[in-house]
């Protein structure tokens, strides 16, 4: 049997412009901020929090002949707003990087944006 392809799932979704107030952590937590197994659990729900890109990719991969293992990292999304708060972005980026390093080795990374 072939080895399963290890694919990280992650995303950061924000439509922003400089005229709107800064998008802080609460802006993301109020719409979608999931990490690790929370992502896989949400995919299984009929109307989860995740942006459509994540469950759509997951379901497409499940319907291929490619054996794969999804490795959920972090997915966050906000309503349209201003630029992301710099301190929150750095903390989130560092968390994503740490989780990616822990998930190594990887065959691919799916990033929803």
Model-found features: residue ranges?
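Glycine-rich phosphate/diphosphate-binding loops that line cofactor/substrate pockets in enzymes
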Residues: 1-4, 63-68, 100-107
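N-terminal amphipathic/basic leader segments beginning at the initiator methionine
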Residues: 2-64
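Active-site histidine-anchored catalytic micro-motif
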Residues: 8-15, 29, 80-113
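Proline/serine/threonine/glycine-rich intrinsically disordered regulatory regions
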Residues: 20-21, 74, 113
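Short beta-strand elements in bilobed, periplasmic/extracellular small-molecule ligand-binding domains
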Residues: 66-78
């Amino acid at each position: 049997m072939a080895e399963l392809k290890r694919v990280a799932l992650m995303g950061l979704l924000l439509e922003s412009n400089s005229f709107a107030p800064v998008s802080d952590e609460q802006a993301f937590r109020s719409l979608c901020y999931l990490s690790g197994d929370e992502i896989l659990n949400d995919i299984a729900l009929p109307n989860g929090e995740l942006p459509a890109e994540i469950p759509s990719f997951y379901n497409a991969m499940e319907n291929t002949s490619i054996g794969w293992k999804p490795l959920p990292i972090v997915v966050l999304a906000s309503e349209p707003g201003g630029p992301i708060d710099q301190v929150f972005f750095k903390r989130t980026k560092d968390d994503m990087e740490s989780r990616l390093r822990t998930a190594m080795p990887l065959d691919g990374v799916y990033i929803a944006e």
